[in-house]
């Protein structure tokens, strides 16, 4: 796909979007209508930070970890590479060694394992902890996945989360990659300026380089 246009790789946020079991359902409503106010519609948004396309801050899994405003926003803007890792139960150093990743700073993984934003998956391919030092050696500072988590859905240890941030690698989850080709792109996936938050929704977009 060659285009000069930005391509949206975010899950649209609407009242049908899937959320983590037990987490806050997404809701948008007009809480103050133009008829009531006399001039404007005012919307009310209720959601979990980890709904749809979002980033994780270390505070999400570490009480002493950095929060969103502590993160380097430069990481979320710049050249990125998309690669296909479909049909794998887990992804680690072994699976990525065959790819040429020298000079890559941001890496998005297409697993094509779950494409329904309105259904929460029962199982996902996850990242193994040994991926973190491998990515760090390559100079990669951000990893993105097209599933809700880098760890197994029922996992409590969150080894991949911990090891990735230990090695200076930021996490982007629930990107939508089924409609874009492998290759090099410019990425913008900026978090909101949420002072004390453990993560943030993002509008992730890419443009071919």
Curated annotation (Swiss-Prot):
EC number: 3.5.1.9
InterPro entries with a match to the protein in the record: KFase/CYL, KFase_sf, Kynurenine_formamidase_bac
Amino-acid positions noted as binding substrate in the UniProt annotation, renumbered to this chain: 20
One Gene Ontology term of the molecular function aspect: zinc ion binding
EC category name: hydrolase
Pathway named in the protein's UniProt entry: Amino-acid degradation; L-tryptophan degradation via kynurenine pathway; L-kynurenine from L-tryptophan: step 2/2
Reaction it catalyzes: N-formyl-L-kynurenine + H2O = L-kynurenine + formate + H(+)
Residue numbers binding Zn(2+) 2: 56, 161, 173
Cofactor(s) needed for function: Zn(2+)
Pfam families: Cyclase
Active site, UniProt feature: 60
Free-text cofactor note: Binds 2 zinc ions per subunit.
Keywords recorded for this protein, A-Z: Hydrolase, Metal-binding, Tryptophan catabolism, Zinc
Binding site for Zn(2+) 1: 50, 54, 56, 173
Keyword Zinc: yes
Record-linked Gene3D superfamilies: Putative cyclase (3.50.30.50)
GO term, biological process aspect, one: anthranilate metabolic process
Function: Catalyzes the hydrolysis of N-formyl-L-kynurenine to L-kynurenine, the second step in the kynurenine pathway of tryptophan degradation.
Family: Belongs to the Cyclase 1 superfamily. KynB family.
NCBIfam families: trp_arylform
Oligomer and partners: Homodimer.
Protein name (Swiss-Prot/TrEMBL): Kynurenine formamidase
Organism: Bacillus thuringiensis subsp. konkukian (strain 97-27)
